[in-house]
Structures are given as C-alpha cells and as structure tokens.
Amino acid sequence: MGYEVRIWQKDETPAFDAFDEFEPDIFMGQSYHLDEALFKCIQHRPHMKVVLRGSDWGDIQKDIDLDKYPILVASKEEKKLLERLKEETGKPDFVHNHYHENWIKHTHNKWEDIGIKPFSLIHGADVFEFGLRPPVDVLKCDIGFVGGYWPYKAKCLDKYLIKLCHPVGDYNIKIFGNRNWPVVQYMGSIASENVGSLFASATVSPNISEPHSQDFGYDIIERPFKVLMSGGFCISDYVESMANDVFINNEIVFAKTPEEFKKLIDFYIKNPDERIKHMKAGYESVVENHTYFDRVASILTELNLPEEAAKCINVKMSLFGAEE
C-alpha cells in the first residue's frame, strides 16, 4: 500500500530520537504511555494525526470491583495529561479500544468529558498468519487450544477446559502456550505459523474468556477471529457482546455454563458434519467484516482519509479474488 511503518520500542529509544528519525504522519500509541517527552513530540508536530488506545474510563466502572477484576482503567495522572494534551494541541484525534460500539459508549464515555472521542475498534484476524488450510495429521485432536494459564484466567479455564482433561484419555486434547499448564495435555509452545493449522486440525477450538468478559459481557478477545479465519470450528463461553453484537449469524456456538459447554463438545465430536455450516459462516463473516484490513480502513476513515481507507479494502478484496 506504500506505507512506511516503524514500531517504536519505547524502552529502548527515547521519544525525541524516535520521532526525529522517522517523522511520522500518523502516530498510534497508548494513552497510558503518554509522558512529558511524548507530549512535546506531539506538540511540536501539529500536522501529525494521533490515535491512542484508551484505557477504560466510563460510567460502567463504578459497578466493577477492580480488585476482583483487574481491568485496565485510566489513572488520575493519565486523565490530567490527556486533558492538557487535548487543550494545548487538539490531540489525540480519538482514543479507541477493542469493545463494540454498543458498549464503548459505557466503558469510555468519560473521555468525551475532556473533548476526546472514544472509538470502537474490535479485534480481527491477520489474513497473512491465518487463513484456510488443510488439517495436519500430528495436530489432529478433539480439542485444540492455544493460550496462557495464570491464576486470573484459570478461574474460567479450570471450569471449562481443565475439567475436560480428567480422566486422561476421555478426550484427545492438545494444549499449547507459553506458560506451564497443570495437565499432561500441555504440549509446550507452538510456532506462530502453526497456530492456524491447529485450529484447522482440531474438531473443536474452544474460546474461553476471562472472568470480567463472562460477568460483564463487553470484552471480546482475539482468539475467535483467528479460529474462524483458519476455517476452524469454535465453541465459546458466553460473552454478551460477542453473541449479540459481533457473531450473530451462527458463526460460533455459545455455551452459557460449563455443563452446556461439555454437552456441545460431546455433540460436535460425535457429529462433526454439524460443524460445517458454522465453519462456513464464520470464515465468510471474518473475511467480509473482521480482518485487520477492515480495522485499518476504519482508522483511516475516522481520520478523514477516505481514499487511503478504500486502498485498504481494495487490497483485502484483491487477496480474496475480487476488488471494489
């Protein structure tokens, strides 16, 4: 597409050096990384468009126990510095987060109080890393899962996935990840280029969210997009926004309880052809609406760069056999 992109390793290169060396037209960062040095770099470049991933700051936080649910929320210092940045520079152009637009008005509405628009930018799929592929014999299994295991996430993993690991042998389960899982089905790490092959080879690729996603319903993780883009079949725990806002056409089968999750696993292992309609709907949905080409196009549209946004979509369409 003709863009030059530089990833700034902020802990290795000072802000002034990074910006002087590259002189970006668009800067994308995080609201919680704003400091005085970055402030000045933005201030000295009035032509530069600025997009920041914004921490949660909205009415919904008053109902959430942040000791129980470690959600990233905006700090007092972060709010003050962003308010000053907006007053003095008019930046950022907007903040975004990966919640659907039906929810971001509740999770991020306080940003509007300081003149900053919150923008929905849900996760998607990388079409170069994930895509249709044949099953791989050594990765074939009843249940295939890639992810980490730590105490907070274990609150859900234990009920949905770990429970199925016992007795050993009831299911052919392959678990990969960068942390040690407390089960013999854990097979260590997996190369990133093989993750999509696991999703394509497993009978079921489950999606299991963290406690706040299940309990509050708005945080949709990236895994289901990867599974569907790879042509895999996904059974997911129930996350309200994922079921009602994003995957609303039978792309994913949802289970509201661990018991229902197990029943669905058993049904689709015994009846694998019943997966096909969901796999087809899932792949088509992601290709049409949920690739990272679509997400970049959304950013460029919001920045009032419609011609650049159209280029993104045309590149996507050319990859899938058509062009707008």
Regions found by a protein language model. Name each.
Residues 42-44:
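Short amphipathic alpha-helix used as the core "switch/output" element in two-component signaling
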Residues 1-22, 30-40, 54-57, 63, ...:
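Nucleotide-sugar donor-binding catalytic core of glycosyltransferases
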Residues 24-25, 257, 291:
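Short, electropositive alpha-helical surface patch
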Residues 262-324:
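C-terminal amphipathic helix plus adjacent low-complexity
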Residues 46-51:
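Short beta-strand/loop segments at the ligand-binding rim of alpha/beta enzyme cores
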